[in-house]
């Protein structure tokens, strides 16, 4: 990466927002390949070349972009040279992969300058999925209601381009993006399930979606922060998109041009917003009436300002004490922990009943068993079955695969309040492994276990990572060690969700 820093150091005064020339640089495509932005990109699948990165294709693409008008590649070009048997798809892949690197440069520079400040200490820990759960433990126990929001998708690709133009002020780059998006829409009808290559870079689509989501999030958060100035203000709407960021400090009244409904905003220091996987959570200590106002505010903001079709049914209001939130592989809810305190005053004694709210995080066992059933580890009732597709592998390979899945699930679900569901998942994987090995050796499970014993499955029962750490800190038999094993542990090294955990 250091050898490319010279190229990426753009002139802050004149060239910071002009990214189009970078599309003609070979090192951009090398970055897309080396950093694995899309592993199916820029790989040759033709005869004699194998799966190797080809700088020759990159050079020819750059020459064609220099010589041809607006990157127009005719459909007849694929018949001109057998070396480019699917060059239309390959060119689209390469352009989208390179553009995915280029368009992130302004954001990367801002992130580097921001993370170097004192306010972001150990920013790498914030990348972990588990980092959000300690925050929920501290905040959700004091809140009453939660809005479960299903974020709508843009109905037109032009909306994605328009959202990006406030960050990338290079018209040529935006025209290239617009051209690539429309070419993708024209070519995707020719894609068949048998083709193993993807026309467009999913990382670029994810970047465009997040940029679009940041647009309405910035408006929502700004209105939230300015709500103290609007506590007694009833008004219509005013939001001019182009000059919005320049008018933030002057915005006192908020009104809509498209409809005449009044908007009431109230100061609420106990409101938290989280967006994840196309969904969002808005938790607050407000009453149900005020939460209902926030609900229709979201719907109106999407429909009348961002031109995204949305209905009130996509935003559900739930009470935290009566509702379990399906959030990142956990069922989270707020429950009461009753306790009794005996107090003695002189000759009189009395008992004080006290109840504390705590965040309860449980494993969605039904959904997780459904994922294991789809992966052919068990049936729909949760009874373990053999994995016939793995029966051709060696015994050690089969055991390693099952142990790896078991440890990954245990690692991710280490924050569960109840470990019994996790033990059931381990049981399913353990006996699925035994049945797979018995199927391979054409034996019954009973005879297989009797012949080899259970020593080969000891990896399922070896101490977990947290147990090993605690055993180094506390002596064996320490009275809190057993309690620590049962407690919740959140890891700051988990940056992706296991495929089985993501059961949606």
Curated annotation (Swiss-Prot):
One of its GO terms (molecular function) is RNA binding. InterPro entries: Domain_X, Maturase_MatK, Maturase_MatK_N. Its main location: plastid. Signal peptide: none annotated. One of its GO terms (cellular component) is chloroplast. It is found in: Plastid, Chloroplast. It holds the Pfam family MatK_N. It comes from the Eukaryota. Usually encoded in the trnK tRNA gene intron. Probably assists in splicing its own and other chloroplast group II introns. Belongs to the intron maturase 2 family. MatK subfamily. This is Maturase K. It comes from Pentaplaris doroteae. The gene is matK.
